[in-house]
Every structure is written in C-alpha cells, then in structure tokens.
C-alpha cells in the first residue's frame, strides 16, 4: 500500500472500526498475500543468482547490477506490504493492541515511514538508469560496457544517497496512526510545510517517465535499423526493459492523477486503487524478467521452457571407416 501522502484523507474514525467482518477482511489480506509471496521469493532467488551462485556471469553485465538494486527495493516493499502495511489494514482483530504498540514505540514508526518513502524514491531513479542503459546499448554498442563499467560505482552511490534529499522531511516529521477499514496504517505529518513528500516524489517520477519514454523511442528507432546485427540477448533485455517501463508508468499515472485532482487524491478510491497500481510494478517486475530472459529463468528456476531453452551442445558423431579386402578363390568373392 502506498502511504506517501503527508496529508491524510478525511478521517472520521479516531479509533479502530469494529464494524468490519474479521473473516472478510482476513480473506482480503490472504488473497493479496497469495500473489505477493511468489514474487518476493523470485526477488530473493534473483538476488541470490546474480550476486552469489552466478556472480561471475551477471556482475559483468551492468544491466543486471542495476536491476539487482531494483530487486532489493521491490523485495523490501513486498515484505513491508505482507508483514506490516496490509497486514494491519486487513487483520482488524489486531487493530487495538497493534496500534497502541506502535504509538508507544514511536521508533518503529520513525523507521518504517521514512524507509517506505526512501524505497519509493529509489525506484524511479533506478528506472532512469535501466532505460538509459538499454538505450546506450543500441546507440554505442562498442563502447557501451566500458562506459557503464566506469560509472557504475557513481550510479550505485547516486541511487543509494540521493533519496535522502527528497525524504528528509519524513525523517524529522511526527508520525501518526490512520484508522482505515477495520485496521490502520502509519502516516507522517509535515514538520516543514512546504516540503511535501508527495510533490517531491511526483516530480521525480515525472522526470523518470519523460526519460523512460524518450529513451524507449530512441531505442526502438535504433533497433529497427540494426535488425540482425544486434545480439539476441541484448534484444531480450531491451524488451524486458520496455515491459518493465510500462509497469512503472501504471502507478506513476495514478500518482499524477492524485496530485492534479484534489478530490480524487483525498478520496478513499485513491487509497484503495493506489496499492494495486504499485503491485503492477512490484509484483510484475520479477515475473517479467523471468519470463523474458531465458538464461535468468534457467538459473533462477533451474528449468527451461520453450524457445528460450539454453542451446544444447551439438552431438558428436563418430564415423568409423571399414576397409574391405577382396580376394578371389575359385571365382568366389570373400569380404573381410
């Protein structure tokens, strides 16, 4: 669930609402957890494959290094959703004791809320570098790896540190409990009025969308000219990046709608739709990479499917030559 807004929606309940059915709300949670747990497992496997089991293969490819950062972010966001955010929204039987626990242990809220916004800020930055990486691979295929290898350390540092320039107000701001459905979630007020985290994130995502669209158009135009000169593996990663970009634009669209339409942004509809919009990206990302990249799928799942199976080594056929000696005895031919 997205809880970036520092301006809470109109809330009438200042305590847990007992009118929601425990069973119905729990089923809602289980249904959402059911589709979030498998991608979380895939994220963990992808990170294990890239950085442990097949480190020598993937660490030399800058795209996978950058994508591993996206996997870390997506993995943590799913864990927060599964075990904290949606858990306490859709498990109303824990609303009273859990809300009191968080209110009496404010350190947990002071960690959770800035961390959530940090991850949401890092995602568009990673998206920018993913699309730029694929665009440069078709524009400068010869020098592409050399340039990205040289600047990879800077990219990692930039993505890791720059979100703090955006989320600083969420760190120093007081955190509160917002009662929602039969449960609750945690939100931050603004210590500095003009430093609106929703606006900051909207600007970052807007820049990411503009760069993504421009890079994708350039990439497709260049790929159409290269045709068969481009390696199939590079084409595969470009395709994966394009689909990933589409998934990124889905939550970005609804975030923009909430920022430009105040009535929608403060309505319960926004708070209901936005989490599922983010699921398109966080749940879809590992599925896309596993589906599109045959090599990664083979390493992560240790299976091969269809046309993306690793090519088998050609069979060696040994040909033995037999020499026939012919002799004639009394007109009879004898073969040895």
From Swiss-Prot:
The keyword Membrane applies. GO terms for biological process: sensory perception of chemical stimulus. SUPFAM superfamilies: Family A G protein-coupled receptor-like. InterPro entries: 7TM_GPCR_serpentine_rcpt_Srg, Nematode_SR-like. One of its GO terms (molecular function) is transmembrane signaling receptor activity. Its main location: membrane. Belongs to the nematode receptor-like protein srg family. This is Serpentine receptor class gamma-9. It comes from Caenorhabditis elegans. The lineage of its organism: Eukaryota, Metazoa, Ecdysozoa, Nematoda, Chromadorea. The gene is srg-9.
């Amino acid at each position: 669930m997205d809880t970036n807004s520092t301006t809470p929606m109109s809330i009438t309940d200042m305590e847990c609402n007992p009118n929601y059915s425990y069973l119905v709300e729990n089923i809602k949670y289980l249904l959402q957890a059911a589709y979030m747990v498998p991608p979380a497992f895939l994220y963990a496997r992808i990170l294990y494959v890239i950085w442990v089991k097949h480190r020598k293969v993937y660490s030399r490819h800058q795209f996978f290094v950058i994508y591993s950062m996206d996997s870390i972010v997506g993995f943590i966001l799913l864990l927060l959703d599964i075990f904290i955010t949606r858990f306490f929204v859709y498990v109303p039987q824990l609303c009273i004791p859990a809300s009191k626990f968080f209110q009496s242990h404010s350190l947990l809220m002071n960690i959770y809320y800035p961390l959530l916004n940090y991850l949401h800020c890092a995602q568009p930055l990673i998206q920018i570098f993913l699309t730029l990486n694929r665009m440069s691979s078709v524009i400068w295929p010869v020098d592409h790896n050399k340039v990205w290898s040289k600047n990879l350390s800077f990219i990692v540092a930039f993505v890791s540190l720059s979100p703090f320039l955006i989320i600083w107000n969420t760190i120093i701001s007081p955190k509160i409990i917002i009662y929602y459905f039969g449960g609750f979630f945690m939100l931050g007020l603004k210590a500095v009025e003009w430093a609106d985290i929703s606006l900051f994130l909207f600007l970052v995502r807007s820049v990411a969308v503009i760069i993504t669209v421009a890079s994708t158009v350039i990439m497709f135009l260049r790929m159409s000219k290269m045709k068969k000169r481009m390696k199939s593996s590079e084409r595969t990663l470009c395709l994966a990046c394009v689909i990933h970009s589409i998934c990124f634009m889905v939550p970005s669209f609804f975030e923009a709608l909430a920022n430009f339409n105040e009535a929608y942004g403060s309505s319960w509809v926004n708070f209901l739709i936005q989490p599922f919009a983010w699921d398109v990206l966080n749940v879809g990302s590992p599925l896309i990479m596993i589906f599109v990249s045959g090599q990664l799928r083979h390493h992560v799942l240790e299976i091969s499917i269809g046309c993306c199976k690793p090519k088998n080594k050609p069979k060696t056929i040994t040909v033995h030559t037999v020499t026939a000696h012919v002799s004639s005895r009394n007109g009879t031919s004898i073969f040895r």
